[in-house]
C-alpha cells in the first residue's frame, strides 16, 4: 500500500524530472518529504483505528537515522509517531513515568536509541521546543535542557531554547509569599 501511494504522489514529479524541470536533488527532497508525509499519516490512522497492521506498515523499512529524511518537512512528526509507537510496545513499563509527567523524557529517550549526530540533536531540540512552546511549564524540561546544553554546547538550537528555559525555571522557582497573606483555618464548616 505504501509503495502504491508513494508512486501516485510522485508521478507528477517523475515527469518534471524527465523533462529536466526539476533537478535530481530536488526530486529526492520531494520524495523524502512525500515518504515522511505518507508514513506519518498512516501511523496516525493506525493509532486512531487501533490497527496494529496499519501502524506496522507505516514503519516497515523505515530508517529513522537517515540523512535523507532529515530534510523532509514531516520528519519530526514522523519521528514522534515512531517513538510513540516504540513506547506503546512497553506501555506497562513506562506508565510510572507517564503518570509522573515524563512524556518528553520518554520520547527523547527513544530518539537516543535510534538517532545519531545531527538527526538526534535536531529531534531532541524539536521535541523540547514543541513542549516548551505549549507553556505547560513541565518541570522535566529543566533537566532535559541542561542535558542538551551539556551535550551540544555549540548547538544553534540553544538560542531558541534559552528564553523558554528561563521562563520554565522562573515558574518553578520558590516564591516568597507576603507576610500580609492570611490563610483561613477551620474551613470544614464553611458552606459554598
Which residues are covered by each model-predicted region?
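Oxidative protein folding and maturation machinery
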Residues: 1-191
Amino acid at each position: 500500500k505504501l509503495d502504491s501511494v508513494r508512486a501516485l504522489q510522485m508521478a507528477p514529479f517523475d515527469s518534471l524530472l524527465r523533462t529536466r524541470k526539476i533537478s535530481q536533488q530536488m526530486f529526492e527532497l520531494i520524495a523524502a518529504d512525500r515518504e515522511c508525509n505518507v508514513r506519518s499519516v498512516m501511523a496516525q490512522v493506525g493509532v486512531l483505528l487501533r490497527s496494529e497492521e496499519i501502524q506496522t506498515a507505516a514503519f516497515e523499512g523505515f530508517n529513522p537515522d537517515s540523512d535523507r529524511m532529515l530534510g523532509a518537512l514531516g520528519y519530526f512528526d514522523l519521528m514522534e509517531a515512531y517513538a510513540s509507537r516504540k513506547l506503546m510496545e512497553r506501555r506497562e513499563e513506562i506508565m510510572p513515568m507517564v503518570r509522573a509527567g515524563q512524556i518528553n523524557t520518554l520520547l527523547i529517550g527513544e530518539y537516543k536509541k535510534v538517532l545519531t549526530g545531527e538527526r538526534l540533536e535536531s529531534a531532541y531540540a524539536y521535541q523540547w521546543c514543541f513542549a516548551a512552546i505549549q507553556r505547560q511549564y513541565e518541570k522535566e524540561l529543566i533537566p532535559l535542557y541542561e542535558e542538551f546544553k551539556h551535550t551540544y554546547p555549540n548547538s544553534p538550537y540553544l538560542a531558541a531554547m534559552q528564553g523558554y528555559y528561563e521562563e520554565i525555571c522562573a515558574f518553578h522557582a520558590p516564591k516568597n509569599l507576603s507576610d500580609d497573606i492570611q490563610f483561613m483555618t477551620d474551613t470544614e464548616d464553611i458552606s459554598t
